[in-house]
Amino acid sequence: MQVTAFALTRRRMLLALGGACSGPSLAGPPAQGPARGAAPLFDGMGDYRVPDAAPSPLARRYFAQGMVLAWGFNPAEAARSFEGAIAASPSCAACHWGLAWALGPTINADMAPADALPAAAALQQARALASQASPRFRDLIAALAVRHPGPGADEIDEEGYFARLRALAAKYPRDADMAVLAAESLLNLHPSDWWQPDGQARPWTGEIVALLARALTLAPDHPGANHYWVHLFELSPNPERAAPQAERLRTLVPGSGHLLHMPAHIDMRTGRYAQAAAANQRSIEADERYLAQVDAQGAYRVGYVAHNHHFLWAAAAMQGRSQVAIAATQAAWPAACGPRPGDLGSGVLQHYAVLPLHALVRFGRWQELLTQTRPPDGNAAYLLAMWHYARGTAWARTGRPREARAALQALQSAAAEPELATTKLKNINPAADLVHIAVLTLQADLAALVGRHDQAVGWLQQAVAAEDAMAHDEPHLWLAPTRHALGAALLDEGRAGEAERVFRQDLRHYPENGWSLLGLKHALRRQGREREAKAVQARFQAAWRDADVGLTRPRF
């Protein structure tokens, strides 16, 4: 039995999210196990079909739906669809295979312990019925048996599984599903680790690209191939390589909220913020239709439904659409938990609870910030720290140094809480890292307020370095790029050339965002480069065309 580093070293995002919202109706299968009740057949699941999966039309429809839902990162609902396929055709070996596959690990989550026994039972049934399956499903069942050599969730041999799938992709060179499943397994082995910091591909990335490219050539509308291609290239130096797949996903599976959302990952990297916002609005609507049909809770709701609101905020903020952005932050928490109470000890729920504070800071709503109720003491150290940060920023930006200093002292005390080092936001970055940026930013605001502009620049340079050192997440967990503040501080210091470099750096991170375009215009103008400044002003006007707030500085 092989217990790989894949299983041992990471307890990734979705397992941490599944228990974040509590309540009596959450009793039952935890994490990503099958949802309760009979599986519905949803509208809008696209045209993906698997003719050799099952003998009955109903089972084939459930099977195809399960595959699409799994590729749309809703494994609990996918498992329920495979159970529907089994109910319609109990002797369907492929349907049992699908259930075992859906309960396994993904690029976002290791296998949940509670899913191990159901997966083992489904795989056992698939193996018992394999003689009735098509040749390729017999091969897939045998490959999945390599992945799950024992019943434990930590007994995953992903490397052995990938080796079998690589061989099957070669054996079936005209089979898009085989290529996607092989690529998926290799992605699982190296989650989000496909590009080096300098933009060069990792040693395994070329094979992932080749497998997915083959699948897309064979089946341009394959939901899994398009989804994984976007994830692969959103982190690359050339995110535009996934623009065709992003466009396809806008309409490919209108019933999958997550697949509708996926184009936004490329839109944000390529400066198409209006399209990113629209993609998330469509995904929110699709998930609302889905949630009206099923009582989905746990990982999908917390990890993906709320994520759409978070992403909408990020896109709308880059457009200057304050009303849409602020409303999106206020909707994230309810989207995560619905009517269930949330556990503020969960880093992801504290993250969603903090979003409205960040939004009010981003848009300079100082008086609204000062009326925000202090969070209760207890297990929400991150939320409390960011409340102090937001209030301190409001005091500093309204010219109240004594109050701002008191808030900074409270923030520094809150930052010393040991809990912050172990509280992970979306199981990616420690809350302490973000609180550190908050301390540096508030120190800079206070220094600028009392005329110590050079000191303010120094604090903000440290904040930029701290932000750059964070692990990647999209949207970025620090919700107002620190380069906006640094560039503004450099302009205040008369250091226009340095400000220009900072704003150009930010525009490489967030192309055509109005905040940095405005800052760049000011920096060029102060250097006497009026022709260039006018060209950038035209770009700013295009970027800010849908804004509902005026902008005279690169930050409020």
Question: What are the residue ranges of the model-derived segments?
Answer:
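Residue-level recognition of tetratricopeptide repeat
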Residues: L58, S91-C92, D175, H222-P223, ...
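Solenoid-like repeat scaffolds
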Residues: A87, A169-K171, L218, R248-G255, ...
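TPR repeat positional signature
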Residues: Y62, H96, L103, D139, ...
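N-terminal export signals
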Residues: Q2-L8, R12-G28
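Residue at a conserved register position within TPR or TPR-like alpha-solenoid repeats
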Residues: L69, L103, V146, L186, ...
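TPR/TPR-like (Sel1-like) alpha-helical repeat modules
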Residues: A100, G104, D115-A128, M268, ...
